[in-house]
């Protein structure tokens, strides 16, 4: 009888301790590591519904401080992103270095022309698949910058050629695409 009672007490104790440990992982009052915060920022950026191929946001997390960088096409995106990130558990402060691109009909036309030229081209069309296309097109007063990720140096070069041929940009295309070879698993 005593051993059965002791066994039940141990099981209940283990369940209580286990649920307390599980609660600790979701408790927003607990300190978060920079890696935890970074995962949260990445998740929020991937699920932000208004982030488009014409916006580009990057971030850095250090000691609970999130620094945001990049360009967006609308002021509401800048404030939305800032507010969303500021509410993440563990975030101490947000340094907002996001630039709002000027409103320009000419830039909007150029964005659409370049997007069509890149994403309708057979060797680059795969980068437009899914909810988050990997090539971003930033147009600031006619100056074009390509950001994001491609699989090969050839795709990076083709994207530059397609962007150059698409419209009347002011100056050369600033190609900041990163080449990341896909894993073969």
Question: Can you annotate each of these PLM segments?
Answer:
Residues 2-11, 15-185:
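N-terminal targeting leaders
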